[in-house]
Amino acid sequence: MNFIRPRRFAVFSSLVLGFAATAAVHFQRLPAGGMQPQAATDAAHTVHLLWLGGEPKAADVFYQKLPEGRASSDAPLRVNSQPGSAIAIGTIRGAQFALGRQGRVHVVWNGSGGALPKPADSAPLLYSRLDDTGKSFEPQRNLITRTTDLDGGGTLAADTTGNVFVLWHAGTPGTKTTEDKRRVFVTRSGDDGRAFSTETPVTDSSGACGCCGMKALADDDGNVFALFRGARGGVHRETTLLSSRDHGVTFAVSPLQDWETGSCPMSSAALGVSARGMLAAWETKGKIYFRPVAPVAGEAGAPEEVTSGPGAKHPALATNARGETLLVWTEGTGWQRGGDLAWQVFDAAGKPTAERGRKPGVPVWSYAAAFARPDGDFVIVY
């Protein structure tokens, strides 16, 4: 398969001299014991935060709104109706969320060992949404009806017309589930998550990396994008883009970058909307790469290596109103091991600014999220 050759973009001081930082970066800690934050901002500049808390092997999912990114006096809402039905161990199978029509919050997560309801041949993929009052979440539901052996984390996207798309990789009923035979599946809702279709395959049986997560996002035009890691032949673990221009009915499959390894790296990826189009960030060989994947005005280009240290994982993206983008990731995290934050701000043309850094304090089983404030500055949540 053909891949775009990456451009090396190591971020050292000698490379950023002459760039004036415009957006500053601020930091916000999760509540005590919080892990695996997710952040999204709506049209009213309200920041929506999601995170895990409690026991890592039997965690809870929490949600909170921050008006214009400021601290809120409202207590967080627990998303999961069954206590301890989420899982933080592994840093891959936690909760993800999306904002749909009229700002409704949709959440999906891999179920813990005791999570219910449970399908016959798999851990559950659980879903809930904010109810019509906006004050609590509906009882959790399992979305798996026929696939087997859920492993790496599922994902979801939602658009402004009531469509919700939930994707995960799994085995096919009646066949032995090996990594090189796993497929990506999607279930769709056209009524704001009230009901979902039976899952259908998006990819062929050429594989998906078992313990790696996925990331999905819908743009303002209702196009749906998702990232997953393949497992072609059991060794070609390429970061792969799925893109749908027909509201999730069909998906084009585009490999972005190969990684030849016989073992699963337990990686995650990020998507973000910017003036340059849809942006993607992912891990390859312990480094973070970054590029537009649905560019405007014909812009494309090779993946850019942006990391400055070893063991880079778990990227997240945020873009402000000026078109500047913050890319944040972790360094040194691993199994039962926390690590550091690292970040780089890019200008509206995608060039690195002088705003970059590294900071300790990422907890075990965690990573960072980010959002842009109305004044253009960025906040990293960890």
Residue ranges and their predicted role:
Residues 1-5:
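N-terminal secretory signal peptides that target proteins for export/translocation
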Residues 6-8, 278:
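Short helix-onset patch at the extreme N-terminus, typifying the N->h transition
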Residues 10-20:
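Bacterial N-terminal signal peptides
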Residues 23-382:
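Extracellular, repeat-based ectodomains that mediate carbohydrate processing or recognition
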